[in-house]
Structure formats: structure tokens, C-alpha cells
């Protein structure tokens, strides 16, 4: 029974990931708000998992195990996203409005659109390469989904504006340089953290709007 349920959930996820976003508010047939949220959460989860897998593979390939802890501590304040007043976890996110969380999610996603365009060149001969070379398209797709939700929920509240003025550097393809390796390692760490934030915000919004048994996270 559990296997059948898992299979059905997986098939639903695959189906939702293949659905297009409505291009206009008046598009027909209109997608229910619950489906828009479900679609966005699935895409964010997929991207977060991809970012985590990519980070781990890079770490295994290039960062000596004995150096990982000290490097990770040094990277604690590296991410530009730490400079914006976005919630740092689920509890803080629950104190913000849906529109605030959508705007922060959008800022986080947009800050990576430039840097990830070189990501696939960092992972030659990589098991992750088959998906990492499509990260840009996946980010654009999630950006579009968040914008669709914002159109549906537009409430006239003040916009957060261009808070994240500084985007991330691009990934360095010179993997023979120790500095480049450390830079890429730091970027991948931030990429993983930022996508986790975006996923958390979207899940908080979905759960408080549509009470369901899968809200615990």
C-alpha cells in the first residue's frame, strides 16, 4: 500500500513539473491557486535537491575532507542574501505576509540567474551534469511561477524593491586554481542555502492556505 501511494505521489509530482504556468490572469483554463502553489513548491524542492546534490558532488571531488569544516565556518557570512531582511527560517517566515515571502523568493531566484549560466562547465564528466546544465531554465521556470502567484495575490502593499542590488559572481571554470575551487565551493553553498529559503517560504505559504497532513517540515 505504501509503495502504491509513493508511486502515485511521484507520478503526480512529475505531472505537475510538466505543467505550464498560466501566462495571463485571464488565461483559459485558469489554474487554481492551490495548483499554482503545488507547482511552485515542487519546482523549488527539485531545485533545492539539485543544489544540495551538486554541492555534495563538488565537495567530494575537490575539497579534502579534513578542510571542509573550517572552510564552511569561514563561509558563514559569505552569502549576499544574508544582507537582505528576509526570514531565516520557518518560524520567522510564518510572521510575514504571503506577498512579502513571494517577493523575497523572487529576489533570491533572480540573484542566481546570471551566475548559474556557467555552472555546467564546472562539472565536466559529472553525474550531475545532465541536470546542472539546465539549472538556468529551471530557475526561470520557478521565477515565472512565483510571478504568476504574485499576480494572483497582488494586494497593493508596498514592494520590497531592488533590495538585493548585488548579485553573485559567476562560477569560475578554472578548476586548477585553489582560489577558484574555494570560490565555487562558497557559491554552491550559498546557492543551496538560498534555494532552501525559497522552498521554505513557498511551503509555509502553501501550508497555511491549504491545510494538509504534509505540512510538517
Curated annotation (Swiss-Prot):
> Which UniProt keyword terms apply here?
Disulfide bond, Hormone, Metal-binding, Phosphoprotein, Secreted, Signal, Zinc
GO cellular component: a single term: extracellular space
Single GO biological process annotation from the record: growth hormone receptor signaling pathway
Report the SS bond pairs. Answer: 79-190, 207-215
Alphabetized Gene3D superfamilies for the sequence: 1.20.1250.10
Segment forming the signal sequence: 1-27
Q: Where in the cell is it found?
A: Secreted
* Gene Ontology MF term list: growth factor activity; growth hormone receptor binding; hormone activity; metal ion binding
Modification Phosphoserine, positions:
132
Q: What does this gene product do? A: Plays an important role in growth control. Its major role in stimulating body growth is to stimulate the liver and other tissues to secrete IGF1. It stimulates both the differentiation and proliferation of myoblasts. It also stimulates amino acid uptake and protein synthesis in muscle and other tissues.
What is the protein's name according to its record? Somatotropin
Gene name on record? Answer: GH1
Amino acid at each position: 500500500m505504501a509503495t502504491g501511494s509513493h508511486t502515485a505521489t511521484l507520478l503526480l509530482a512529475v505531472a505537475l513539473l510538466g505543467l505550464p504556468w498560466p501566462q495571463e490572469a485571464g488565461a483559459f483554463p485558469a489554474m487554481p491557486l492551490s495548483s499554482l502553489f503545488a507547482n511552485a513548491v515542487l519546482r523549488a524542492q527539485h531545485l533545492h535537491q539539485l543544489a544540495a546534490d551538486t554541492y555534495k558532488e563538488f565537495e567530494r571531488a575537490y575539497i579534502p575532507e579534513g578542510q571542509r569544516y573550517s572552510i564552511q565556518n569561514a563561509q558563514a557570512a559569505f552569502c549576499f542574501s544574508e544582507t537582505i531582511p528576509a526570514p531565516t527560517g520557518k518560524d520567522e517566515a510564518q510572521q510575514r505576509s504571503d506577498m512579502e515571502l513571494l517577493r523575497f523568493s523572487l529576489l533570491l531566484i533572480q540573484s542566481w540567474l546570471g551566475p548559474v549560466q556557467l555552472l555546467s562547465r564546472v562539472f565536466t564528466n559529472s553525474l550531475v551534469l545532465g541536470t546542472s546544465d539546465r539549472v538556468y531554465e529551471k530557475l526561470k521556470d520557478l521565477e515565472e511561477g512565483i510571478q504568476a502567484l504574485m499576480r494572483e495575490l497582488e494586494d497593493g502593499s508596498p514592494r520590497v524593491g531592488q533590495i538585493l542590488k548585488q548579485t553573485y559572481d559567476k562560477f569560475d571554470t578554472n578548476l586548477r586554481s585553489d582560489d577558484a575551487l574555494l570560490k565555487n565551493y562558497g557559491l554552491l553553498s550559498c546557492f543551496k542555502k538560498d534555494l532552501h529559503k525559497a522552498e521554505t517560504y513557498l511551503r509555509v505559504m502553501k501550508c497555511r492556505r491549504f491545510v494538509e497532513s504534509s505540512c510538517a517540515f
